[in-house]
């Protein structure tokens, strides 16, 4: 994929270590999204916080190795770098124990981080970072900017409530759910509908969002864009683990859509990207454009 223009993308939220037994991999949904966007040609920044501890030093080193600037990843004297214990079930689906409090719960903005968002084409944020009021208040301030906003819903019990989710949805131009999240949130807001398509339109009617995407695991995804519905039924891969697959999907989709790609082409590209991540270990495997295109044309 060649970008017609270079996107400037900023993500706000958690940067942490995913712990798989004796192994740890860098993660955090917003970081995963912008890493994929960077791999696809975007100019990216990550606003977060890690501890002044060995885990934090290791994250800074790792992020620099991955080619991201670390100036907007702040350091905390008082809180440790975030850790998540990841457990995979027999279907290789992940469950998460997210330790609290962590440094990313305590993100405090400065002039540089505010300026990054004001000058960006797109701000990507999730719901998990709002579990603590310090980071939540920082995000709410950024949501007052005119930058295009992408909300990556990330329901991790018990770290969310519906009032905050409603605020986050109403601030977004684009909202991404998985199918279970869309169903849960639609029911919580008294949707009379049963299908994903109906509930996508229902969420649009509740919010200011003009685009909604819903992932369906191995069955691909739906995209509501400019009042048209697009669908991809998924690409087959042998699943290694699902960690980060939805994040890479979103990074690819936003990169394509905001650089002028046709919505169906963008959705196909994003579904193939997410599938290849699910077929690889960890949240941020290296994936080439040719691998993505080969999978798109394979079926």
Segments from the language model and where they lie:
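Active-site beta-alpha turn of Rossmann-fold NAD(P)-dependent dehydrogenases/reductases
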Residues: 13
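Residues that scaffold the ATP/ADP-binding catalytic core of kinase and kinase-like folds
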Residues: 19, 97, 184-185, 277, ...
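A short, flexible beta-alpha/helix-coil linker loop
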Residues: 16-19, 156, 181-183, 237-238
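Conserved phosphate-binding/catalytic region of the ribokinase-like
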Residues: 1-8, 189, 193-299
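A broad detector of short, well-ordered amphipathic alpha-helices
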Residues: 32-35, 118, 170, 264, ...
